[in-house]
Amino acid sequence: MPVENSVDAFNFNALKDAVGIDPFAKQTNKYARDERFYVLQKDKNGNGAALIRFLPDSEKRMIVQMYKINTTITKNDKKRFVNEFSPATIGLPCPFQEKWQDLWNEGKKDEAKNFSRSIRYIANIKILKDPANPENEGKIFLYEMSGAMNSKLEKALNPSETDVSLGKTPKQLFNPLKGNSFRLVAQRGSNNQINYDASEVVAEETSIYQTVEEAIKDIKENTYKLGDLLKPESFKSYDELKKEFLRVTFAEQTAAPTVVQETVAPVTPAPVETPVQTPVTPVQETVAPVASAPAPSANDDLDAILQGLV
């Protein structure tokens, strides 16, 4: 059989239609991983572990909260997805949020779930031990957390009165000189989904730097400014997200839905019934309440570091 016939026998257009992009176009790196973010490597069984330390950034921020679009739609056995941070985080319009709002207002709550946004939490971490990728050790990354993981941190930082009465003490998660490391553990659950339920705070307080000056230098030079994630230019533009909306909804070749043709309007507050859609307090000033820990020496160390970041 001539070679050219073999090539013609493969339908490149069908492949493009199936995945929603031209797999051989230069822009295929649009799905490349953001190397600033740490990803815990898992084995074939879904297990993975690393030892990390949370750090403040050079502007003293500990954690920022962001909305994320995570939409997957299947049509005629073809699956397409979008996984992007939403500009609704900072009050800018987002076509996915608008579509969710329209469907919700029409009473189509199940369909609206396809366009709902999740809440994610971002922090700086330093990798202390990474058995699967030892080359990561000593490096600082951004780490994206779920609400469940963030709650685990909050409970460690600020235990309830009941827990305190039972002997539990606040942990110094963001203190690099006299604080607690965090054991990040991934496992595959009974539902076949990866979870981080086994992750835990290390009880022993340790220092990951020799001096305050060393800590300040590393934080200033190598952490990522969390405030930069909240700048408009850090998000895809409305037009770019509209193109993503049309692609994921298989609407590229048809008239765009009304939701993306309307004049851009402020995002409408979400109904109470869907907590993940509820607007949050502006995240620019979000910091972990480290100072609530009672140990004076630990607080003194952290205060010295934060003063050095001014």
Which positions does each model-derived feature cover?
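OB-fold ssDNA-binding interfaces and closely related basic DNA-contact patches used
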Residues: 1-173, 236
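Extended acidic low-complexity intrinsically disordered regions
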Residues: 1-28, 267-268, 272-273, 279-280, ...
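Compositionally biased, intrinsically disordered low-complexity regions enriched in proline and serine
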Residues: 32, 39, 68, 82, ...
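Compact mixed alphabeta submodule
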Residues: 129-263
